[in-house]
Amino acid sequence: MSQIMYNYPAMLGHAGDMAGYAGTLQSLGAEIAVEQAALQSAWQGDTGITYQAWQAQWNQAMEDLVRAYHAMSSTHEANTMAMMARDTAEAAKWGG
């Protein structure tokens, strides 16, 4: 049977990258919101009402996406830490 080796520092780095991507998405969302605000003032009547509904959906989707990236990052980090702790405990049993 072959031995499975994990690169825990790289895995934790990946979790950090994922958290950074969430920040990037949030920043891009803020930039897009500025552009959308300019459009909002130009749309009146039925078009404005339709725009408001679309904007609410967009805002919710952006929040959900950022929240999902944060959740994936923290889950990946927690699982990596748990695996590393388990590996350390098992290695200690064998004098490693």
UniProtKB/Swiss-Prot annotation:
It is found in: Secreted. Zn(2+) binds at residues 14, 70, 76-77. It comes from the Bacteria. Keywords: Metal-binding, Secreted, Virulence, Zinc. One of its GO terms (cellular component) is cytosol. One of its GO terms (molecular function) is metal ion binding. InterPro entries: ESAT-6-like_sf, T7SS_ESAT-6-like. Changing residue 76 to A: Still interacts with EsxG, but impairs interaction with host HGS/HRS. Contains a number of strongly recognized T-cell epitopes distributed throughout the protein sequence and induces high level of IFN-gamma, indicating this might be a good vaccine candidate. A fusion protein (p846) of 3 well-defined antigens (EspC, EsxH and Rv2660c) induces robust specific T-cell immune response and could be an effective vaccine. NCBIfam families: WXG100_ESAT6. Forms a tight 1:1 complex with EsxG. When it is complexed to EsxG, interacts directly with host HGS/HRS. To improve expression in E.coli the proteins were cloned as a single protein in the order esxH-esxG with a cleavable thrombin tag. EsxH, in complex with EsxG, disrupts ESCRT function and impairs host phagosome maturation, thereby promoting intracellular bacterial growth. The complex acts by interacting, via EsxH, with the host hepatocyte growth factor-regulated tyrosine kinase substrate (HGS/HRS), a component of the ESCRT machinery. Belongs to the WXG100 family. ESAT-6 subfamily. This is ESAT-6-like protein EsxH. It comes from Mycobacterium tuberculosis (strain ATCC 25618 / H37Rv). The gene is esxH.
